[in-house]
Amino acid sequence: MTVLHSVDFFPSGNASVAIEPRLPQADFPEHHHDFYEIVIVEHGTGIHVFNGQPYTITGGMVCFVRDHDRHLYEHTDNLCLTNVLYRSPDRFQFLAGLNQLLPQEQDGQYPSHWRVNHSVLQQVRQLVAQMEQQEGENDLPSTASREILFMQLLLLLRKSSLQENLENSASRLNLLLAWLEDHFADEVNWDAVADQFSLSLRTLHRQLKQQTGLTPQRYLNRLRLMKARHLLRHSEASVTDIAYRCGFSDSNHFSTLFRREFNWSPRDIRQGRDGFLQ
């Protein structure tokens, strides 16, 4: 597995924060690094496989990666990221207690993926731009300024995470997308889902298409197919069983959609013919 080292990304040995844009981010194999990062999804779509679990990522998603996490990007489509790298929560010169603002693992579950709305994403970009402007400065005031900006970034993300922000339709759409990640195998009635998240059906269709480039049903089908591909690679369940577990009532229809999406049949994936290394 590829290991990325801080010496290749941080501007100096005492720099606590570094900005690494990926515009765009191409497919990238599984890797980990000796630093932490906050991945800000600017726009586009892709699959982020995080510690073996696939997540569909779109604009407005924020991913918190620790130094022992492993992850990869695949099936990217105009995916643009800004990575905010930091050495460790306890490696800041002027800040302490940052860990309290970061996602916390509970009962083996780590909430690594958050969503923020468009207006918050704009504020995030402004903070990141200010940090970038100061990257070449190594004096104490500049270091302190960068760390203060990093603290402001964490506070903004914390306050604006979907759990705390349901004031507008964009935030409710983000909550809906997170709900789909957990309920992709359920039979989805879009009228009922729109009501559940206080959205009109027309607004749901329009905003989901704007954010993901896909219609709601197309997005759901892709999400189900991604989950199915993961199970084909990492479980012993039959193709038929996986189809049912991922929300498809007809395994033949599942196989047709699967081949159309990935250009490989479910059996090809199961046998590793796509070249994926497990």
Swiss-Prot record:
It is found in: Cytoplasm. It comes from the Bacteria. The record marks D241, D250 as: Interaction with sigma-70. Pfam families: AraC_binding, HTH_18. Residues 174-272 form the HTH araC/xylS-type domain. Residues 191-212, 239-262 bind DNA. The keyword Transcription applies. Keywords: Activator, Cytoplasm, DNA-binding, Repeat, Rhamnose metabolism, Transcription, Transcription regulation. Binds DNA as a dimer. HAMAP family: HTH_type_RhaS. This is HTH-type transcriptional activator RhaS. It comes from Escherichia coli O81 (strain ED1a). The gene is rhaS.
